[in-house]
C-alpha cells in the first residue's frame, strides 16, 4: 500500500502514522533535528543517506514523488532549505549546551520566536550571566560593566586563559582575572529580585470585590454577581462588632461599637446571616468555625446529625465530614465514610486540649432538642470541650467524631431562672464512652477556667493571639513593613562617596560601586602621569596612584575609561519605580479613608436593639 504522508514519532514515542509505539531497534533518529522516525512507515527513498548521519525527510529537503500528491502539509523546498540551514547553524554553535540546542530547535520547528518572550522574562535576562545564561551565582563585574558568575568567569579567564570580555571583547586586566571580587550590590539585587518574584506569585492576578464595612447595609443583601436569589447567595451585611474571625470566648463590650454592651447570652437573630454580623458564629452554613492549627471558636447546633444529644448545660456534638457532597450538594443526611480528626474536627480537639471557650449558638432547626429556640438563631454562651473520641454513629456503619461540651459561662443560660452563671460541675456519665475509640481527655490545666477567688470564669492563661489583621491601620503597617524591606535593600545600591542611590553606577575592579560623576569628580584634575624634573633636568614621568575611596586598590587604569554598569542601572530604576507606585497606593488608601464614605447608612438604634432581643426562660 502506498504511503502518501511520512510522519515522525510524537513526544511519547508513538508513531504518528501507524499509532504504534515501536521498539528502539525499529526507529531512526535524525542527525539534524534529533526526531525519531518509525522505519517501516518510511519510504525506501527516505532511508538512503549520502552522508554518515541519516537525515529525516523534513531536514533532507528531498521531495519524494509518492508523498507529494494529496499532502497539503508538504513544506516548500525553499522554506525547508532555510529551516535545515538554521538547524545546522544551531548544531554547529559550540557555545550552546545540548539542552539549549534542543530548546532552540524546538522553538524553530514550532515557528516560535523571541517575540513570545514576555516583558518580565526580558527583565530577568538583563541580569543573567552571559556564559551560563542563569542568574549570576556569586556575581562579579568586569571593568567593562558586564556581569558573570564567579565560577563561569574563572573558567573563562583563568581556565581557558581568555583575557577579553566575551560580550564586548574589551581587555580584562590580569589582576582582575587573577583575583576577581564579588559584587555585593548585585547580590542584593538578585536577592530582591527573588523576593519580588515570590511576592508577585503569592499575589496572583485575582479580582477581589471588596466592600468596606461602613458601606454595607444592615442586613444581608444579594449582589448582581449572585447566581441565584435568596440568602444562600447573599453577601453579609454590616458587622456590628470589631472582633477578628479567630476571636475566642465571649464578645466583650469594648468590641460592641454601637451598643457598648457586647453580645449577651440569649440574644437571637432571624437567621445565620444576622448571627454572623454580630460575631457569635461567622460561618453561615458550616457548623464549626475554627482552624486546625489554632482551635475552634464557635459551633452551631442546627440538627445536622442525628447523633447529637442536647442536655442544655452539656451536650454531645458530632464532628463534620464523612458525607458525599459531590454534585454541588449542600447537605446529605447519609454517612458514606468514617470521620477523621482533621480540619474542623482537629480544631475542636485542639480546643479540648487547650481548654479554650467555644461559643455555642442553637438554631430552630434542631427539632429534637428541648433547649433550641422556637425560631431564629440564639446565642447560648460559651462551653468547654472536656472529652473527644470516635465511635460508630447511629447509622451503624461508619465512625464519627464525638465531643462532650460542658457550659462554663458567667451569664445564666436562657432556659434557667438563675441569677448567676455556671459553677464547676462534675462531668456527666456518657454510656457510649465504654465502646469509644481514640479517646482524648485533657490533662493540663485549661486556659479558660473558674477563679474561686473572684467567683467567675476567666482566662487563666493568655488567650490565643489573633492571626487575622482587622484594623486598617495594622494592614497599612504591614504593607509599609514590606516596603521598608525593599527600601533597606535599595540602600545596598548607594554610592560610597555621596551615600545616595547610585546614578550611572560604575563597578571598580575591587567590586565597589560609585556614581560615575562622583568617582570622576573625586579624581578630577589628577593626570595619569606626573612630570618630574631635577635642577632643570627632566626626569622620567611617574604614574599617579589613584586609590579607591574604599580600599587601597589602584584605579588609575580603570579611570581611563570607566564603563557604566547598565544592568545594575536598570535594576535600580525598576526598584525606584516600584517604590513610587507602592507609596502612591498607600497615600491613596489614606486619602480614601480620611474622606467620608460615599454611602453611609445610619443605624437605627431601635432596629439594632430589636435584632438582639433577650429571651427569658
From Swiss-Prot:
Disulfide bonds: none annotated. Residues 563-593 form a coiled coil. Residues 258-407 form the YDG domain. E3 ubiquitin-protein ligase. Participates in CpG methylation-dependent transcriptional regulation and epigenetic transcriptional silencing. Mediates ubiquitination with the E2 ubiquitin-conjugating enzymes UBC11, UBC8 and UBC8 homologs (e.g. UBC10, UBC11, UBC28 and UBC29) but not with UBC27, UBC30, UBC32, UBC34 and UBC36. Promotes methylation-mediated gene silencing leading, for example, to early flowering. Can bind to CpG, CpNpG, and CpNpN DNA motifs, with a strong preference for methylated forms, and with highest affinity for CpG substrate. It holds the Pfam family SAD_SRA. PANTHER family: E3 UBIQUITIN-PROTEIN LIGASE ORTHRUS 1-RELATED, E3 UBIQUITIN-PROTEIN LIGASE UHRF-RELATED. It comes from Arabidopsis thaliana. Disruption phenotype: Decreased DNA methylation primarily at CpG sites in genic regions, as well as repeated sequences in heterochromatic regions. Released transcriptional silencing at heterochromatin regions. Ectopic CpHpH methylation in the 5S rRNA genes against a background of CpG hypomethylation. GO terms for biological process: negative regulation of gene expression via chromosomal CpG island methylation; protein ubiquitination; vegetative to reproductive phase transition of meristem. This is E3 ubiquitin-protein ligase ORTHRUS 1. Pathway: Protein modification; protein ubiquitination. One of its GO terms (cellular component) is nucleus. One of its GO terms (molecular function) is methyl-CpNpN binding. A zinc finger (RING-type) spans 129-169, 495-552. A zinc finger (PHD-type) spans 12-62. CDD domains: RING-HC_ORTHRUS_rpt1 (cd23138), RING-HC_ORTHRUS_rpt2 (cd23139). It is found in: Nucleus. It is an enzyme of class 2 (transferase). It comes from the Eukaryota. InterPro entries: PUA-like_sf, RING-HC_ORTHRUS_rpt1, RING-HC_ORTHRUS_rpt2, SRA-YDG_sf, SRA_YDG, UHRF1/2-like, Zinc_finger_PHD-type_CS, Znf-RING_euk. Its EC number is 2.3.2.27.
